[in-house]
Each structure stands twice: as structure tokens, then as C-alpha cells.
């Protein structure tokens, strides 16, 4: 169990029947609890009874974006749910050792909670992040500064932290392998692993230390890559999905980088600088691929930050040990710890360069990322060195070709057709967001939005960068309601949007591509509302996308009143044909106040798309769904299908791609 924030707890539970039998093939579940928990450490390894609806986490809604379901799989969690209440059902373990184990774990978790409560607010976030990987105490701006500087790894308990503490242990014990020293080492590794929730990087570091010590005891040579491979195999055998986690990938990639690159760097470089440079070389393209950003100061910033962390971690751990054991020593050490925390933050902030320490980049192709890393590791290997010395160029080229073929194969296995579609109805939650592209140009209509969540920064920007879009040529808004306009405004604050327009009226035509067969026609309204801030749904802009012979009607939040008024206007001009469309973006998220029967009869779509997310409004309305299905219209929804893509295939019709497959 770990605290997520001030108002919410997350509990990882293992499911059993009421008689204490573990459910067959039952995965772990992650439960969210929104009430206060007194003495939460008592829940560690306790049995609880609860009633909750458990479900599967949804896969990613948009292509090449964060996949929460995959993240949970990497942690060996398959189910999620929300707790309203629970009761402790404590049962004693069968053996004394298991009882002792459980009580010691609870003691550690208790100390961590109480330790956090006694820290000063200005240093709590950094200390809990660096020491235990608990970033919930840090504000988002501080975390972003660490990310931009390439120093965020100090906020996730990693091999760096375990290595620092292991190095301190070696100095204190003079690297002895006597029984008491080994017992002390085992206790330390278990304790720190428990406090850091056994993150993949912690598990990797702990197991590699165990192998190193075992090698000394058995008088066997320790090889870093062999140990790394063995640990990797053990973790994959335990949970094959662990490879989906970025923490796992970065941890093992960082060690591979040190193993391959550090030995080819100039010998004059200090070990700490050589390791930092090797890790940066190995992770730069991976970070661009995974996080769509490249730090310009990472190498320079890591030198002082890692140096200070080398002193900060032992001091923080010493402070934690004295907490609750010797209050006087704790009180004497705390001022030094606070001062070092402020110094570490000051040094890190100094490298942000006013927000210019990192640049956003579009996601490089997967095949290029794999080929770059595989080729670089091969070029730095002893095998390649021997082949070069023997002038066996054909074998070198053959190895590189094999790496390239493997990279291309991986690219093929992860291919997503929706990434290349002409029109994508982006999953922005409860809101509208439509991405159009043609001839290298990109147009965005609406952009979702929520007062509780930055859709522009956290949804739209990762979507565009992850799918190779570095700028938006034109952004249009049907109207200024939050769930259409706010996300677009947030995007424009930290992403290049060349031009924005809102309040378009009937008769306006927009050509955003050199292709003469692609244009956007505005059909409604005839006049703008007097007060744009109070504009009603019946007067929002309505667009008809003409795309190489196909037509897509985009209605924003147009309600029944607006639909019938627009219909009457075009009927009066004998131009109802202008309303006919192959695809209808259903108005107002499928609300019962939209999609009038007469309107649907005139538009006569074959495909309908409802942009809707989890909501309390009853969207989409069952009546609207019934009207559409009664007319033989194929219905696609963002809340069910995730992002929805349209590929116009000329005489072959329209291909619809979705991120998720709907349940049968």
C-alpha cells in the first residue's frame, strides 16, 4: 500500500476467497480509496474484506501515447476498482518467521509515513522522492524541471541510490563477507527494497548486488552483462509483461550503456562523469522515442546533481534511521539535510535556463531507435573490435544488417494503421478533438478540455509529438465551450499552432492543403451570437469536410433546435444535398437534445462518430443510438473504441480504424 496524494490511497491487493484460499489464476488488483485511513501502515500484508466492482483497465485511447493498462501489466496488476469501505480481517500467519516478517514490514512502512509527516514542507517533496521514489509530495513544476534537465532519475529509486548505499556499506564493513556482515547486507537490501516498493530498478540493483557477493563467496568472476542478463531473465520469467514498463526498460538500458560505452570513453574522465556520459549516450534516443523530449543540459546537469545526491542519499538515510530511535541526533541532522535539499533544488533549477533546457521532438521511428541502440552496442563490443582488427568487413556489415532486419521486424509487429489515417477523432475524454491531415498539413478542429485536467499538455501534445506532428497549421473551434475550446488553448501555450480561428460563419471556405480535392466548408451559423462567451449550442460552427470525393459533417455541439433551423434554411434554398455526408460527427456527444430524426434522414450517413468520454450526463443517449442503428448507421464511440481513424480509399470506400476493439 502506498499513499498517492493527500486525498487518495491506492491499495495493491491479492484476491482470496472468504475461507482464505487464493483464487486460481487470480491477478493482483489495484484499489483506490478516497477516504482517510488512520494508521495506514497497518494495512501492509493484512487481510481485508471488501465489496467492489473490479474491472480491466482500458488500453491507451490514442496511438503512441501512455498505456495505463500496459503499465499495470508491467507491475503484474490486471484489475482495478474503487473501494467505498473495507474491514480488516486479520489472521495470524502459520509460522513465527512469517509473523516476524510481516511485523517488520509494517514497522518500516510506519516509519516512512511518520518520517514524511515530520519533514519540513520545503524539503519533504525532494527527500521523499530521492529516498523512496514517492513523487506525490513534489509539485508538478519541480518534477518537470528534473525531467527537462535529464535528472529525473534521482526521483525514482534506482541503481544509483542502491549503489550509493551499497558503497557506503562496503566502506563501513571494509567489504568483508563474514556471516554478520552478510546478514547486515541482507537486512539492508530487504529494508530498502520494501521502503521503495520494490520498483524494477531496485529489484535489478539488489539482485545484481546479490550476484556480485555470491561471486566473491564462490570465487567466481563477476561479469556485469552476464549478471544483467540473468536478472532480466528472472524478472521476465516471473512476469513476462515486465518488459512493457519504462522503468524496466530504462534501468536495463542504462546498465547496458555503462557496460558498452564506458570502456570506450577517454580514460582521463572521472568514473562518475564517464558513467553519466555513457548513460546519456544510451538513453538520448530512447527518451526521444518514449517521452518526446531531449535535454540539452543533461550531461552537464547530471555531474553536480549526481555528486550532491551521493552525499544527500546517505545523509537522508541516516536521518531516517535516527528518526524514532534517537530524537536528539535526528534534530541535529535535520538542518543539514534541509540545507542540502535546498542546495540540490537550487543547483537543478539553475540548469533549467528559463524553460529552454529541453526541446520537444517528434517520436523517432521504432526501427530507428532499435537499430541505433543495437548498432551502437555492437560497435562498442569486443566482437566488433576483433572483427575490425581482422578486417572482416563483411561480417560487420552482416551483423548490422541482422540488427536492421530485427528492428524492421519489431516495427512491423507494432504497426498501427490509425497513425496514418486521414481523419482521426482523438480521444480527449468528454469533449471533441478532430485531427485532419493532407499533404503534410495538419488541422485541428476543437481540442477537448476540462477544468480538472490539462488536456492540451497531457493529451493533445503527447498525441501529436508521438505521431510525428511538430506543429499545427490551423486550429479551428466550433464554439468556446470548455470541452471544445480549452484544450486547444492549452495546447497553443506549449506547442506550435500557426493560426487559430473561432466563430466561422456559413459561406466561409478553408483550404489547408495544396490538394484541390480537399477543403473545409462552413455551413452554419448564418450570424454569430452577440455574446461569444454565452453562445448557445444551436449557433456553433458546423463544417463539411470534403476529402477526395467523401464528405464528413462536423457538428460540434449543435442541438436539435440548431439542426432543424439549419435544415429549414437549406430546404428553403433547395440545397439539402449540401447536408448529405458519408460520415457524421454526432452533435453534442450524442445528447438526447441532438440528432433529430428529420436531420438524420437528410444527412443519411453510413458512419457516425460520437466523441464522448466518461461522464455523468448520460451521453450518449439511448434514444440517439437507437435512431442511428435503426437507419443502419455504423456507430463508433471514443469511450468504447478510443481514437477513431478514417482512411479514404477512393473507389474502395472508407476504412475505419480504432484503437480498441469493442466488446462483443
Predicted regions and their residues:
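Hydrophobic alpha-helical segments of integral membrane proteins
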Residues: 96, 100-119, 126-127, 134, ...
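Hydrophobic alpha-helical transmembrane segments in multi-pass membrane proteins
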Residues: 81, 139-301, 315, 362-418, ...
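Short, cationic motifs built from Arg/Lys/His that form the positively charged side of catalytic pockets
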Residues: 108, 204-207, 220, 484, ...
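Non-globular, low-confidence helical/coil segments that flank catalytic cores
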Residues: 39-40, 44, 48-53, 64, ...
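Feature for secretory/organellar precursors and membrane-associated catalytic proteins
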Residues: 2-4, 247, 428
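Membrane-interface helix/helix-cap signal primarily in integral membrane proteins
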Residues: 1-153, 457-462, 471, 503, ...
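Aromatic-rich juxtamembrane segments at the membrane interface
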Residues: 74-206, 213, 424, 551-556, ...
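Short hydrophobic/aromatic residue motifs in ordered secondary structure
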Residues: 59-60, 161-164, 200, 250, ...
Amino acid at each position: 500500500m502506498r499513499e498517492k496524494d493527500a486525498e487518495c490511497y491506492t491499495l495493491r491487493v491479492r484476491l482470496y476467497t472468504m475461507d482464505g484460499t487464493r483464487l486460481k489464476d487470480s491477478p493482483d488488483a489495484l484499489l483506490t480509496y478516497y477516504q482517510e485511513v488512520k494508521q495506514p501502515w497497518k494495512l501492509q500484508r493484512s487481510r481485508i474484506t471488501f465489496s467492489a466492482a473490479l474491472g480491466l483497465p482500458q488500453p491507451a485511447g490514442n496511438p503512441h501515447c501512455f498505456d495505463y493498462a500496459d503499465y499495470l501489466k508491467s507491475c503484474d496488476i490486471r484489475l482495478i476498482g474503487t473501494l467505498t469501505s473495507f474491514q480488516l480481517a486479520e489472521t495470524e500467519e502459520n509460522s513465527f518467521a512469517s509473523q516476524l516478517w510481516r511485523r517488520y514490514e509494517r514497522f518500516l512502512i510506519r516509519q516512512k509515513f511518520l518520517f514524511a509527516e515530520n519533514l519540513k514542507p520545503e524539503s519533504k517533496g525532494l527527500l521523499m522522492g530521492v529516498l523512496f521514489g514517492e513523487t506525490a509530495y513534489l509539485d508538478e513544476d519541480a518534477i518537470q524541471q528534473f525531467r527537462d534537465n535529464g535528472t529525473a532519475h534521482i526521483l525514482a529509486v534506482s541503481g544509483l541510490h542502491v549503489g550509493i548505499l551499497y558503497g557506503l556499506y562496503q566502506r563501513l564493513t571494509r567489504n568483508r563477507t563474514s556471516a554478520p556482515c552478510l546478514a547486515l547486507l541482507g537486512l539492508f537490501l530487504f529494508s530498502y527494497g520494501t521502503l521503495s516498493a520494490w520498483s524494477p530498478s531496485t529489484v535489478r540493483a539488489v539482485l545484481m548486488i546479490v550476484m556480485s557477493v555470491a561471486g566473491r563467496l564462490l570465487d567466481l568472476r563477476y561479469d556485469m552483462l552476464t549478471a544483467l542478463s540473468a536478472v532480466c531473465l528472472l524478472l521476465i520469467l516471473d512476469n513476462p509483461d515486465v518488459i512493457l514498463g519504462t522503468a524496466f526498460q530504462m534501468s536495463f538500458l542504462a546498465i547496458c550503456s555503462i557496460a558498452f560505452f564506458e570502456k570506450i570513453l577517454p580514460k582521463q574522465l572521472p568514473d562518475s562523469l564517464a558513467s553519466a556520459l555513457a548513460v546519456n549516450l544510451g538513453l538520448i534516443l530512447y527518451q526521444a522515442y518514449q517521452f518526446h523530449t531531449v535535454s540539452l543540459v543533461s550531461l552537464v546537469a547530471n555531474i553536480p546533481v549526481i555528486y550532491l545526491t551521493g552525499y544527500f542519499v546517505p545523509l537522508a538515510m541516516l536521518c531516517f534511521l535516527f528518526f524514532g530511535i534517537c530524537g536528539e541526533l535526528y534534530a541535529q541532522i535535520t538542518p543539514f539535510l534541509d540545507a542540502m535539499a535546498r542546495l540540490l533544488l537550487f543547483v537543478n533549477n539553475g540548469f533549467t535556463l528559463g524553460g529552454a533546457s529541453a526541446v520537444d521532438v517528434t517520436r523517432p521511428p521504432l526501427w530507428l531507435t532499435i537499430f541505433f541502440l543495437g548498432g551502437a552496442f555492437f560497435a562498442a563490443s569486443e566482437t566488433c573490435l576483433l572483427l575490425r582488427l581482422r578486417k572482416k568487413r563483411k561480417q560487420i556489415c552482416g551483423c548490422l544488417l541482422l540488427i536492421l532486419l530485427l528492428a524492421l521486424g519489431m516495427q512491423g509487429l507494432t504497426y498501427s494503421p490509425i497513425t496514418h489515417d486521414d481523419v482521426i477523432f482523438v480521444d480527449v475524454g468528454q469533449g471533441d478533438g478532430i485531427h485532419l491531415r493532407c499533404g503534410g498539413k495538419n488541422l485541428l478542429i476543437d481540442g477537448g478540455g476540462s477544468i480538472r485536467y490539462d488536456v492540451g499538455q497531457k493529451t493533445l501534445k503527447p498525441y501529436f509529438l508521438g505521431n510525428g506532428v511538430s506543429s499545427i497549421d490551423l486550429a479551428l473551434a466550433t464554439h468556446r465551450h470548455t470541452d471544445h475550446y480549452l484544450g486547444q488553448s492549452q495546447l497553443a501555450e506549449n506547442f506550435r499552432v500557426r493560426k487559430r480561428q473561432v466563430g466561422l460563419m456559413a459561406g466561409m471556405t478553408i483550404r489547408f492543403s495544396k490538394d484541390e480535392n480537399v477543403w473545409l466548408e462552413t455551413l452554419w451559423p448564418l450570424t454569430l451570437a452577440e455574446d461569444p462567451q454565452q453562445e448557445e449550442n444551436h449557433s456553433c460552427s458546423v463544417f463539411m469536410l470534403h476529402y477526395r470525393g467523401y464528405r464528413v459533417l462536423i457538428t460540434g455541439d449543435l442541438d436539435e433546435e440548431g439542426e432543424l433551423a439549419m435544415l429549414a434554411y437549406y430546404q428553403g434554398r433547395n440545397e439539402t444535398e449540401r447536408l448529405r455526408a458519408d460520415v457524421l460527427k454526432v452533435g453534442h456527444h450524442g445528447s438526447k437534445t441532438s440528432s433529430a430524426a428529420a436531420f438524420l434522414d437528410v444527412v443519411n450517413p453510413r458512419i457516425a462518430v460520437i466523441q464522448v468520454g466518461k461522464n455523468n450526463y448520460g451521453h450518449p443517449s439511448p434514444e440517439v443510438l437507437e435512431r442511428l442503428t435503426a437507419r443502419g448507421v455504423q456507430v463508433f464511440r471514443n469511450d468504447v473504441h478510443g481514437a477513431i481513424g478514417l482512411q479514404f480509399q477512393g473507389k474502395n470506400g472508407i476504412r475505419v480504424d480504432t484503437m480498441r476493439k469493442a466488446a462483443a
